[in-house]
Regions:
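N-terminal intrinsically disordered, acidic low-complexity segments at the extreme N-terminus
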Residues: 1-6
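Flexible, solvent-exposed loop/hinge segments and secondary-structure transition points
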Residues: 8-270
Length: 270
């Protein structure tokens, strides 16, 4: 009967000549097994450190991106020590789509791609954009685990051009933290003033809805008298109307409305 004692087997293997093919194969297998185990153990031990390193890199990249958005640097600096996150939102449902790198998503490219974009019903297209992407990025800022601010990309037709900007909301999802436009070609000296700090500074603290939750944000002619009204620019009524319409579109059912609703009722962890 064969001796199955491992010590006996080991002694027998060691007694083989070094030129023995069997001994060479066994030694090679043992070395490979030992090295593989060492690598696996090291990887497991280093994984928490690697994850922390990747998270620091992601936060730094996110902060750099958000601070590069026109008018957003002060909002981020003012928020203090926050955790930043970019998520990709399915606009129709408001659900967050899991992707490897949401920061690399090109919303304009998808909106222009007939294989991927969405035709907005004419009756709902108050922003005058015709088509939109099916997905859009949203930037979340958290402090101590609670949602502090959210930044949303917006666009829509003005008087003479397409207006591109970002709307920032406070964590209550009703109060405007800021509005900035980074691209437009409106009438010089009139509509172009939507990019001036003096006008953009009118937005923080305004409300997007009334006490009943109805979406009411608007740019009015003259002075605004309601919490959801912002002073218009003299001589740029049509541009102001365009701003009103694009904000209501992107905050509504065909924009980020479903996503904001999911955040509000807690179906998405803010």
């Amino acid at each position: 009967m064969a001796d199955l004692n491992p010590i006996t087997w080991w002694r027998h293997m060691l007694s083989l000549p070094n030129t023995s093919p069997a001994k060479t194969l066994i030694v090679a297998l043992l070395v490979a097994l030992t090295c593989g185990t060492a690598v696996s153990v090291t990887a497991i031990m280093l994984r928490p450190l690697q994850q922390k390193h990747h998270e620091r890199e992601r936060q730094a990249r996110m902060q750099e991106l958000l601070k590069s958005l026109p008018g957003m640097k002060d909002l981020i600096d003012d928020a203090g020590e926050v955790t930043l996150q970019c998520v990709l939102v399915e606009l129709a449902t408001g659900a967050i789509i899991e992707v490897a790198d949401p920061l690399s998503f090109d919303q304009r490219a998808e909106a222009a791609d007939p294989r991927a974009n969405f035709d907005i019903p004419a009756s709902a297209d108050i922003a005058g954009i015709g088509k939109r992407s099916r997905r859009a990025p949203a930037y979340l800022m958290r402090w101590n685990g609670k949602l502090k601010r959210i930044i949303l990309p917006v666009r829509g037709s003005g008087y003479q051009s397409m207006l591109y900007g970002y709307l920032a909301l406070e964590g209550d999802l009703v109060t405007v933290a800021g509005l900035t436009f980074y691209a437009q070609a409106e009438t010089p000296g009139l509509g172009t003033r939507i990019q001036e700090p003096a006008w953009q500074n009118l937005w923080p603290g305004s409300m997007i809805a009334d006490d009943q939750g109805n979406l009411r944000i608007e740019v009015v002619r003259g002075k605004g008298t309601r919490p959801y009204q912002v002073d218009g620019i003299s001589g740029a009524t049509r541009t102001g109307t365009g701003v009103t319409n694009l904000l209501r579109f992107w905050l509504g059912d065909y924009g980020f409305g479903p996503f904001l609703k999911q955040l509000e009722i807690g179906k998405i962890d803010p």
